């Protein structure tokens, strides 16, 4: 199982949770995605993110390439409307180990 964690900072005064609610079903229906959770930092409430679960790294790669229309549309929506572009966006990809 592969987990992708993406975090970013919201623009002050923007209702990012509303964007998450309106985009959740579209994101969850993307081929290859097993599970999706949205998160907000308890330490810095302007920091939001998404935790995406994929079965394999190939599913994640397909999400970014073959599903690029949906993926790019959602990324563009976040960047243009909700995200503070002066602060960093972080992406981390993890593999769950069978230990």
Locate each region found by the language model.
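Hydrophobic/aromatic beta-strand elements that line small-molecule binding cavities or substrate pockets
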Residues: 24-25, 36-38, 51-52
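Short, surface-exposed ligand-recognition loops at beta-strand->loop->(often short) alpha-helix junctions
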Residues: 8-19
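Glycine-rich beta-strand-turn "strand-cap" elements at beta-sheet edges
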Residues: 2, 9, 37-49, 74-99
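Short amphipathic alpha-helix segments
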Residues: 21-29
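An amphipathic, aromatic/His-enriched active-site/gating alpha helix that lines ligand/cofactor pockets
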Residues: 28-34, 53-90
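Long, highly charged amphipathic alpha-helices
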Residues: 18-22, 66
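Short coil/turn motifs at secondary-structure junctions
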Residues: 11-13, 43, 55-59
């Amino acid at each position: 199982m592969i987990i992708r964690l993406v975090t970013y900072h919201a623009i002050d005064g923007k209702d990012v949770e509303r964007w998450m609610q309106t985009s959740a079903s579209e994101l969850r229906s993307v081929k290859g995605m097993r599970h999706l959770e949205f998160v907000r930092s308890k330490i810095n409430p302007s920091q939001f993110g998404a935790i995406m679960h994929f079965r394999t790294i190939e599913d994640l790669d397909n999400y970014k390439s073959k599903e690029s229309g949906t993926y790019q549309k959602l990324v563009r929506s976040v960047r243009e409307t909700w995200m503070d572009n002066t602060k960093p966006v972080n992406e981390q990809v993890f593999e769950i180990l069978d230990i």
